[in-house]
A protein has these predicted regions:
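A conserved nucleotide-sugar
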Residues: 3-44
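Short acidic alpha-helix that forms the nucleotide-activated donor recognition element
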Residues: 28, 44, 50-59, 80, ...
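Aromatic "clamp/platform" in nucleotide-sugar-dependent glycosyltransferases that forms part
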Residues: 48, 67
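Short acidic/histidine- and often glycine-rich active-site loop of Leloir-type glycosyltransferases
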Residues: 77, 90-101, 105-106
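Short hydrophobic beta-strand element within catalytic cores of glycosyltransferases
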Residues: 84-87
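Conserved acidic donor-binding segment of nucleotide-sugar-dependent glycosyltransferases
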Residues: 99-111, 120-125
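A short, well-ordered alpha-helix in the C-terminal region of glycosyltransferases
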Residues: 120, 127-141
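C-terminal alpha-helical cap of glycosyltransferases
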Residues: 144-159
């Protein structure tokens, strides 16, 4: 679905690059889809990386196009890094990004939804800044000191 959305954007002359990190059973499928759609100048399969943070840190935006997720560790890592995030509406994402998408851009769980999210970010640079700030705000929920203060405050409120 990500490749289909990217193919549509490329046909519209949008300028972007996608770097996919990781290994998995879909690799051959992805390679053939990239080749079939003539996307090898736009989409790069980087394979397993011992330290993916180097790549994530230089990314303008993080995209999770999953059909289904449990708790998405990689999406939470993107939030902690303050990356603007485009994620599909699947289990776990609203818990991570807020019910109303306060900390990330939650799209419809479809090719069109992924396309729509990417298109909006490509056409509106201000969204990158806005959602980077939202991600940084969301990352505070993972700060141990803030979590301890919240727990302490909640415990004291009971007395």
């Amino acid at each position: 679905r990500l490749i289909d959305a990217a193919t549509k954007l490329k046909k519209e002359n949008a300028k972007f690059k996608i770097y996919i990190i990781g290994e998995g059973p879909e690799k051959k499928n992805l390679e053939s889809q990239i080749e079939k759609n003539n996307m090898s100048d736009v989409i790069y399969l980087l394979g397993f990386k011992k330290n993916p943070y180097v790549y994530m840190n230089f990314a303008d935006v993080f995209i999770c196009s999953s059909r289904a997720e449990g708790f998405s560790t990689v999406a939470s890592e993107a939030v902690v890094l303050g990356k603007p995030c485009i994620v599909t509406d699947c289990s776990g994402m609203r818990e991570l990004f807020g019910e109303e998408g306060q900390y990330g851009f939650i799209t419809e769980n479809s090719t069109e939804g992924i396309y729509d999210g990417m298109d909006k970010f490509i056409k509106n640079n201000k969204m990158l800044t806005e959602y980077a700030e939202r991600a940084k705000e969301g990352a505070k929920r993972f700060d141990v000191n803030i979590a301890l203060k919240t727990i302490e405050r909640n415990l004291l409120d009971d007395f």
